[in-house]
Amino acid sequence: MKKTTKRVLAFLLASTFVFSAMTAGVFAIASYLNPNLGSSSTSTYMSVNSVDDFIDLIKTSGNAFANIDEPEKHNAANEDVAPTIIIPGISQSVSYLADENGNPAVNSNGEELSGGLLIIDSSTLPGILAGTVAGPLVTSLIMQADMGLSDAVYETVTQVFSIQASDKDGKAKENLKTITYEYPISQMSQDDRDYFYRMIPMKSVVDEIGGEDNLYFFTFPLISDPMITAAKLDKYIQMVKEQTGKDKVNIVTVSLGGTILTAYLELYKNTNYPDINKVLNVVSCLDGTDVMGDFYMRNFNIEDEFFFQEFLPMVMKEMNGYATLGHLINVALKIFPRSVIEAILTAAVDGILDTLMLNCPQFWAMIPKDRYDDVINKYSFIKNDPEYSRLYATIEKFQQARLNLKDNLIKLNKQGALVHNVCGYNLDYSAQDYCFFAAMKSSLTTNSDAIIDIDSTSLGATYAKAGEVLSEEYIATRDPKYISPDGSVDASTCLFPDNVWFFQGQHHEVGRNDVIIKLIAKLASNQINSTADMPDKFPQFNGNRNTRNITRWCFDDADRVFAEYAEDPTLYNAEDIEELRAVYEEAEVYLENTICEPTSAKALLERFEYALYRVGVGDAPADTSTDEALEIICKFVDETIYGVFGADGFSDLNDSKVVIDVPVTF
């Protein structure tokens, strides 16, 4: 059941932001029937914000909700470094449904109802699908028309996400609590410390920023008001100052954490921010993301070839390494007329918006400021209906904070606080993980880290769409030192052009890149204060690499083998040990080089993993020939059928069929 739950949650993560309800239904049913779906070792769901990591955490952290005694005051290990507060990204703060006593509620299977992103009662999924969808599904299939299926999809979506629904005031309907840490990392339980380093992989550099006594983790709920969270952040800052004896703190925002910084700076703009030493924004949501703007505006890429042929194979390939299931689903969807598919897609989007997004201020905080007016006008009932007056006032307040952000940051900077930004760029939303965001139409024009657009994370970079370059006429008028080597980004238009670092081709999951973690440590510890410092090691424009498995697994596995070999040399072949030592040393040297390049990191990992396999660690390289052949066959069948029917269903070729017209709004 654990593997089933993992795949169901992975599906639900996707369906939250993807507008395909039929895809959602198929994924859920397939995941329930096949516990191994998507569990291939080639899956890219890992590192920060990962569903797989979160499920592993829940399975291994039995005392995630354990109480810890309040720590005594202490002095930081490094008196020259201000304490650092991490404001994490989406899914990195764990919330739970609480019972009447404030304890985590459990479902009928005895599982805690908790999560970093979605809180889903997986025990109810089979019953919901059977009781709500099954009947209309069969009837609609027989009649080749929407016989209540879209209504059933809407009801299913609202039931699945009901735990995190918000009311018309913008407040959570259920009793949701968030695990908080009123003490430094050094005072955490071992399970919580392990969780922190899984989410924020700073273990290798923690001494550089003053040690674990100097590092704090400010968690906050997703279903919330960012202005209220910002007020809690201020109290947290005062607590950290008292515990450490320091006058100021460093703030590190990650992804969604940027919205909390935005709210904080607006809420306390009249104080001149006396508590802030410096701010580090790491792929931070400082001006929303077009992913959210598109979803609210229902601005999806529904071009026939993309949506009805390319999209699902791309998503399934990301999940388990092969596009086979995506091609099969494409073919299976042909059993319905196109009008039915469009009706249930619309219903799914309606359900997600009505349950999760429209009444939740934190989701509104992820809309770019220049798209806010269009969104609020689309849902004009929120500003016109008195029942929504509190919600409207709340989201208007944050919109003003967003409009004032640059002025507030300039004010902060004038008080002597540096503001640094670290960004990934030159990707559209189809790149690497979470490629279901490619369904958003802005994917065709964005330059991003595959989640957040570069003008948001960098505070104003000018860009060409991913894969293209700025015009020669534009570049000729700009300072060349701020133009990226690939010609796609101009950093001179950023709010702080000498305090922003760009990693070309870097995905939003920056925890996989050891160089970015090292850069954060240099910035927090005052070793780097601008792009003019250490440009040979940390240039303003760098590449990307994924060293996560090397730093997280390979070194530890090798150390264990070396220790066993030292104790009993007969356990391993001497030549295999020699090769493992050689690749170990090569990896150490490689990681000292902070100029990023992706292919060399991949080659090093493959060599390291093979050396470990030779000494019995890990699995043998799998024979993929059958999977590859099956993928080719299914792709051929899918493309052949699409060539005949296009985006239409099989029955759409029958002119005598009954058609129920449905307005398409997804």
Where are these regions (language model features)?
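The feature captures the conserved acid-bearing segment of alpha/beta-hydrolase catalytic domains
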Residues: 300-313, 407-414, 419
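Alpha/beta-hydrolase fold catalytic core
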Residues: 213-227, 349-437, 465
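N-terminal non-catalytic accessory region
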Residues: 29-252, 259-312, 428, 438, ...
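Positively charged n-region of N-terminal signal peptides that target proteins for export
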Residues: 1-7
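Sec-dependent N-terminal signal peptides of Gram-positive bacterial secreted proteins and lipoproteins
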Residues: 7-27
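Beta-rich interaction/scaffold domains
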Residues: 547-647, 651-660
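Short, solvent-exposed loop/turn elements at domain surfaces
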Residues: 21, 93-97, 429-433, 647-649
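Alpha/beta-hydrolase-fold enzymes
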Residues: 303-389
